[in-house]
Amino acid sequence: MRLSDRDIELWIKNKKLVIEPIPNKELIHGVTIDVRLGNEFYTFCNKFNKNIDLSKSRNEISKILKKVMNKKHIIPNDHVFLLKPGMFVLAITLEKIFLPNNLVGWLDGRSSLARLGLMIHATSHRIDPGWGGNIVLEFFNSSNMILSLCPGMLIAAVSFEILSSPSIRPYNIRKNAKYFNQSEVTFSRIDQD
């Protein structure tokens, strides 16, 4: 069962669901809470051989990832990041979200942005029970236009669903919780699988 706007407000008030900064009621609608774009972006190095061979050893994959993912951009609040056609970048939400063990979150892009060709997440829209941190966004511009993205703009919406029972293996207690408590754009850690 998904939380309604009333339930989202109650869960935040009772600190069962932690969102920092605490959202204004204007950001909570129906069954979602709007999240805003942070100011950190990572782009991929264009000068590198673009083949990432995932069949290689962890160590070899790690070396390749360090070469290809190395351009961090911090955009001031009154500036924009230009997302060119066909460009894939990682970005981050302004909000930090911490889920309890009995709640799963779902990240969805905004329809108005999708109609301009902006994809918010490549495949990973589930936010696991026990997960916490800033959400890393996987932007792709599928249009033929440059899209200007401004820190603080509404970028996505998150809904929350109550589990049938609390998870016995929530994200925050896993040995390999690679992305727990992330506060900046975090590269792929596929080399840690």
From Swiss-Prot:
Single Gene Ontology BP annotation: dUTP biosynthetic process
The keyword Membrane appears for this protein: no
Chain residues that bind dCTP: R110, S111, S112, L113, A114, R115, D128, V136, L137, E138, Y171, K178, Q182
Catalytic activity as recorded in UniProt: dCTP + H2O + H(+) = dUTP + NH4(+)
Active site, per annotation: E138 (proton donor/acceptor)
Enzyme class: hydrolase
EC number: 3.5.4.13
Entry keyword annotation includes Transport: no
Pfam (any one): DCD
Sorted UniProt keywords: Hydrolase, Nucleotide metabolism, Nucleotide-binding
Any GO MF annotation of the entry: dCTP deaminase activity
Disulfide cross-links: none
InterPro entries per record: dCTP_deaminase, dUTPase-like_sf, dUTPase_trimeric
Metabolic or biological pathway, per its Swiss-Prot or TrEMBL entry: Pyrimidine metabolism; dUMP biosynthesis; dUMP from dCTP (dUTP route): step 1/2
Similarity remark: Belongs to the dCTP deaminase family.
Oligomer status and interactors: Homotrimer.
Function: Catalyzes the deamination of dCTP to dUTP.
Stated name of the protein: dCTP deaminase
Organism encoding this protein: Buchnera aphidicola subsp. Baizongia pistaciae (strain Bp)
